[in-house]
Amino acid sequence: MANPNNNNDNKQNNNNNFFNDNPLLAFAIFSIVIILIFKSFVGEGESLGTMMNTQGVAQTKQVKYSEIKKRIEEGAVKSVKLTPSMVEAIIEDNGRKVRYVAQNVPTYDRDLIPLLDKKKISYEGVVGNGFFSELISMMLPILIFFAIWIFLAKKMSKGMGGGILGAGKADKLINSEKPDTRFDDVQGVEEAKDEVKEIVDFLKFPERYIELGAKIPKGVLLVGPPGTGKTLLAKAVAGEASVPFFSVSGSGFIEMFVGVGASRVRDLFAQAKKEAPSIIFIDEIDAIGKSRASGGQMGGNDEREQTLNQLLAEMDGFGTDTPVIVLAATNRPETLDAALLRAGRFDRQVLVDKPDFEGRLAILKVHSKDVKLAPNVDLEIVAKQTAGLAGADLANIINEAALLAGRQNKKQIEQSDLLEAIERSFVGLEKKNRKINETEKKIVAYHESGHALMSELSEGATRVTKVSIIPRGLGALGYTLHLPEDEERFLKQKHELMAEVDVLLGGRAAEDVFIGEISTGAGNDLDRATAILKDMVSVYGMTDVAGLMVLSRSQNSFLGAGAVSTDYSDKTAEAMDSYIKSTLNERYGYVKETLQNYYGAIDNMAKELLGTEVIEGKTVRRIIEEYEQEKGMPSRLAHKDKVAKNKAEADKKEEALKKEISEESDNNKEA
C-alpha cells in the first residue's frame, strides 16, 4: 500500500527540481516581484518629488480631489500644478502656505480649467513620467539584478562547473587525455600496486571477466598517511589501462547551493559511463563520506548527507558489465560511513603506507633521475637516514638538496647537500639571524652534550648523528639529531623506552650538574618523558600499576594521534601519577650519576660545541672513547660494534668507488 507521506515528499522534491532545472524561469519570477516592489516604493516617490519643489511651504496634506475643487471655488487657492494623474494646490491658511495634493484624479475633468480661469488662479502643467521614464523605471531593477547575476556566475564558474545557471553540472574531465603515469613511476608501495593490477586487467579486457561471471570490485579505497602516493597510484592505474581518468576532490561536491552536490555526483557518473571503460577518482572522500552516525549534522537535509546518499545510489546503479571503476583516497578511514564500505561499494581497501628502506631507495632513485648527482652520492645512506618519511617528503629532500647546491653555485648535488636537506626536514631551517648570548649558548651546549652522552651510553637508544647549538625551527636553540642507520624497526621493547627517557632527562641533568641551575629548555623533554611512562602504564601494560589492563584507548589515525578515551578511577589515576613521578626521579638520579662519572667528556664536548657550534656523531664517540681511555674505564659505548661494522662497510664502498673511478680514467686514456 502506498504511503501518502512518500507522495508528499515526492511532490516537494518535484517542486524543488522544477526550480533547479528551470533557473531562467525562477529568475524571471524573481525579477517581476522585485519590479512590483520597486514600483510601489519608487514610483510614488518620483511623482511626488517631481511636483514638490515649491519653496516656503509649511505643510503638505494628502486630500481628495473634491476637497481641492471646493477650495478653488472658495477662492482660497493661490496656484495649481497639474499632471495627468495628480493635482497640487497651494493654499493660504492664516498667513502660511499649505500644499494640498490629490492623486488619482479624474482623467477628463473639463470643468477644472474654466474654473481656474474664472477665479483667476495661476496654474501650470508639469510633465509626468513619460513612456521612456516608465520603461527605465521598469528595466532598471532587472538590469541591476541581471548584472549581479552575471558577476556571480563568472566568479563561481570555475568552481561550479558552468556557473550558477549550471550549478548542478560536474566540472569537465580533469584529464582530457589519458594519464601517462605508469606503475614504474610509483615506487615504495609494491603491495598496493599488486592489489590494483587486476583492475587494470579488467579495464583492458572486461569481456574476459564478464564471460566467467566474475564480479570485479566497483570501488577501491586507497588509505594511508599523507604524501604516500595515493593519487599517483590512481593515475597509474588509469595510465596502465589507457582509460579516461575523472578526478575530483571530495570537497568539490559541496557548494553554497542546496542540492548541487547530489546533482554533480549524478553528472559525474553519467560522464564516466559515456566514456566507459573509465576510472572515477575521488580524492579526500572523507569530505563527503563521513559517518552519518557521528552527529553534528543538521538532519536529513544536510548537503553533505544528500551528496553521500547520491554517491551510494550511483554505485549501486552500476551493473557488473559496466567497466567503470571508482577509486577513492583518504587518510581518515575511521571516519567513513559504514554504508560506503559495505560489500558492493568500496569493499576493497588498499593500504598505501610509508615505504620501508627498499621502497625509500627506489623512490629516491626515481626522483633523482632528472637531477645531477655527484659520483660520491650514496642514496642508500639517505634512505637509511629517512626512516618514517613518505614519498612526498623524499621528493622534497631531493629538490631541497638541488636548491642548496644551486645557491652555492655547484655543478652537482653532493652528499652534504642531501644530508643538509634531511636535517631541514627533521629539525627545520637554520635561524642564522637569531643571536643568543654567551650564557645561553653555554647552557645549550651542556644541555645538548647531556643528550648526546646518554644516547651513546644507553642500550636501546638511537646513536647520535649530529649535535648543534645553532637555532633551528620554531623554537629550538640547539638539537641532538638521531638518524637511524640500521634495519627497519617497527616495535620497541621496554628497555628501549626507558633508554629514551634517560636520553630526554640527560639535558636537564647536564644543566643541573654543570651549570648549577636548571632552565626552561628542558620543558619539552620532560613532557615527552612523562608521555612515554604514561603509555607504558596505560597502553602497553609494562608495569604493575594496572597490570595488563588498557586504561587509555586511542582511535587510530594516519594523521597522528586520534581521540584518546580514558576509563579508570581516581585511585588508579593517583597510582599512575605516583609511579610516573617515582620513575622519573629514579631515572633522573641514574642519569645525573652517569654524567658525573663522565664529567670530563661532557666538559670537552661542550667546549667543542662552543668553538665550532656543530659536531658530528663520530666526534662525540671519539671524545667519549678518549675520556674512557684516559680514566682507564671500560667502554660503555652501546653502539661500538655497530660503529665498527658501519665503518668497515663505508671503507669498502669508498675503496670500490675509487677503483671504479680509476678504471674509468684508464679507459678514457686508452680511448
From Swiss-Prot:
Cofactors named for this entry: Zn(2+)
Free-text cofactor note: Binds 1 zinc ion per subunit.
Binding sites annotated in the UniProt record for ATP: 224-231
Periplasmic side, ranges: 44-130
Residues annotated as catalytic: 448
Membrane topology field: Multi-pass membrane protein
Protein name: ATP-dependent zinc metalloprotease FtsH
Organism: Sulfurovum sp. (strain NBC37-1)
Record gene name: ftsH
